[in-house]
Amino acid sequence: FFAAVEMRDNPALRDIPIAIGGSRERRGVISTANYPARKFGVRSAMPTGMALKLCPHLTLLPGRFDAYKEASNHIREIFSRYTSRIEPLSLDEAYLDVTDSVHCHGSATLIAQEIRQTIFNELQLTASAGIAPVKFLAKIASDMNKPNGQFVITPADVPAFLQTLPLAKIPGVGKVSAAKLEAMGLRTCGDVQKCDLVTLLKRFGKFGRILWERSQGIDERDVNSERLRKSVGVERTMAEDIHHWSECEAIIERLYPELERRLAKVKPDLLIARQGVKLKFDDFQQTTQEHVWPRLNKADLIATARKTWDERRGGRGVRLVGLHVTLLDPQ
């Protein structure tokens, strides 16, 4: 989205690899990249130095968050012409419930098509869309025909679509979970449909139920137009437990750019109420520690993590490290 705004405002950038991010000299990271840059392997959260090695002729831009926010607000206003049931996820993504919409004869497919065309007509930006009977399938569908298309999963399509859908496509299934599922012989939603729910609950806890429900096409979450994102976080579960502070610090160094990128999508000025860290130990007990802080700050997060590591670990191995921020109350 950021790259699309830059290419719109400067057409000379359209056909060349560009990325939004910090400079190599300041050990910056890539926030996002356009499709020509992605062909070279440039990705979000990648160190700028690595991106420039992959793509030496990459054009690096510092980012104009006011312009991105302005475009996002305009897009949100277009959404509101079709429904009041809008659940924003970030500057460039939202769920819309058009069940009761009278536009386009009530056709969700035609509404999505018209919204995409309106966005292009009024902002000269392309958009992709996913149409489905439940939220998680709409999210998956939205990725099927990027960067400028849409994909429809009708209620009748759901059973066949799920049979071959890789579990890694389900929101919340990361590399570690996918590997554990693979070890159980579970690769697709069709595989999980044959699995006992009790087995999943024993192996994955509450997430086991979510996994089972999604594999059946069940997602009872409504589109919440009152939704206000209260926090942003990022975490990593290690393949093997760590036992040394230097390992933990290295993980935080890798997680921080991703936290910064996610926060920038919902709060471009990076202003926050609190920030903190989470450690989960080898006995699955976990601890969090946070305190008031006005702006995202890596040095403070590292100091907080070190204090937590020293005072609460008690010699246990650490299996997960997480960083999070609590957003300011707009009221």
UniProtKB/Swiss-Prot annotation:
It is found in: Cytoplasm. It catalyses: DNA(n) + a 2'-deoxyribonucleoside 5'-triphosphate = DNA(n+1) + diphosphate. One of its GO terms (cellular component) is cytosol. GO terms for biological process: DNA replication; error-prone translesion synthesis; SOS response. Binds 2 magnesium ions per subunit. Its main location: cytoplasm. GO terms for molecular function: damaged DNA binding; DNA-directed DNA polymerase activity; metal ion binding. The record marks F2 as: Substrate discrimination. Keywords: Cytoplasm, DNA damage, DNA repair, DNA replication, DNA-binding, DNA-directed DNA polymerase, Magnesium, Metal-binding, Mutator protein, Nucleotidyltransferase, Transferase. Its cofactor is Mg(2+). The active site is at E93. Pfam families: IMS, IMS_C, IMS_HHH_1. Residues 1-174 form the UmuC domain. Monomer. This is DNA polymerase IV. It comes from Escherichia fergusonii. The gene is dinB.
